[in-house]
Amino acid sequence: MNPLIFKGNRPFDLIAVGRLCVDLNANETQRPMEETRTFTKYVGGSPANIAIGAARLGLQTGFIGKVSDDQMGRFITGYLKDNKINTDQIPIDCTGAVTGLAFTEIKSPEDCSILMYRDNVADLNLDPTEVSEDYIKQSKALLISGTALAKSPSREAVFLALEYARKHDVVVFFDVDYRPYTWQSEAETAVYYNLAAEKSDVIIGTREEFDMMEKLLNYEKSNDQVTAERWFSHHAKIVVIKHGGDGSIAYTRDGQSHRGGIFKTKVLKTFGAGDSYASAFIYGLMQGLEIPQAMRLGGASASIVISKHSCSDAMPTRAEISAFMETAEELV
């Protein structure tokens, strides 16, 4: 059963809020970053990747964020426009802030890492005054990402967007997206992530991310069922807990659980899997698919993206996912 109800007759299917950055992915693989000489530039940031993936699957998508007043900022907005994402609510920073950069290292399919430059970044300067209630109420769903909660004024902007979404019956998806380097302490992180999760209809995260959110509760041992049930006392209708190569489990308020597998593929790198999973999973739910079917779409999309060099550029179309699912081996 799909427990989500999306309001009809709205021009946007999904509006994403938060991080817009640039990924610089290593062209030379099987070596450490110290020996990498060239990188390829892509648009990055978890909410950006999810929005791009959703748009490529056919959802009418918009974005609320902030970019730097330079070539990198223009590269980001231009790419979003090229992918049919509305950029009317992406103001340009005027304080001299820069675009966040993510350098990736691909030593092997199992050994990948990301070096982030996140000081004085434009996306964290998004101000609450730049969040339009009228824009949000035109959407069926809102996607928020945890990284945008790391600092003010972006933090307050996200919470205002959440309030507008709740006011206008906009379904809220929360992609936990925990990046420790943007936070001051584990306690600060847990507090704000929990506050955002309490207002969300669908929460998507890894087991490790949910463990972080439960730090202050002093649980002796993490348990997926207990984790999910905690959020059902708030707004959550679906809680998805991802376990990497072991697939994912989706829990619903009516007590059901659904296990999603993965599809066998030739892995190039590990990053991008979560964003591609989320974009296709959200798409499936918004198309009225049952949760297991939406999870299969997410798993297939993730397998496609981790077999390719980029994240945003690699986001598949619906036809590409269907073709992949027809031939790939599903591991449940």
Swiss-Prot record:
Alphabetically, the GO molecular function entries are: 5-dehydro-2-deoxygluconokinase activity; ATP binding
- Domain of life assignment: Bacteria
Q: Which UniProt keywords apply?
A: ATP-binding, Kinase, Nucleotide-binding, Transferase
The record's section on SUPFAM superfamilies has: Ribokinase-like
What does it catalyze?
5-dehydro-2-deoxy-D-gluconate + ATP = 6-phospho-5-dehydro-2-deoxy-D-gluconate + ADP + H(+)
Q: In which pathway does it act?
A: Polyol metabolism; myo-inositol degradation into acetyl-CoA; acetyl-CoA from myo-inositol: step 5/7
Q: Does the keyword ATP-binding apply?
A: yes
What EC designation does it have? 2.7.1.92
Pfam families for the chain: PfkB
GO annotations under biological process? inositol catabolic process
Record flagged with keyword Transmembrane helix = no
- Function according to Swiss-Prot or TrEMBL: Catalyzes the phosphorylation of 5-dehydro-2-deoxy-D-gluconate (2-deoxy-5-keto-D-gluconate or DKG) to 6-phospho-5-dehydro-2-deoxy-D-gluconate (DKGP).
Regarding protein family, the annotation reads: Belongs to the carbohydrate kinase PfkB family.
User: PANTHER family this protein is in?
Assistant: 5-DEHYDRO-2-DEOXYGLUCONOKINASE (PTHR43085:SF49), HEXOKINASE FAMILY MEMBER (PTHR43085)
- Protein name (record): 5-dehydro-2-deoxygluconokinase
UniProt source species: Bacillus thuringiensis subsp. konkukian (strain 97-27)
At the highest ranks, the source species' classification is: Bacteria, Bacillati, Bacillota, Bacilli, Bacillales
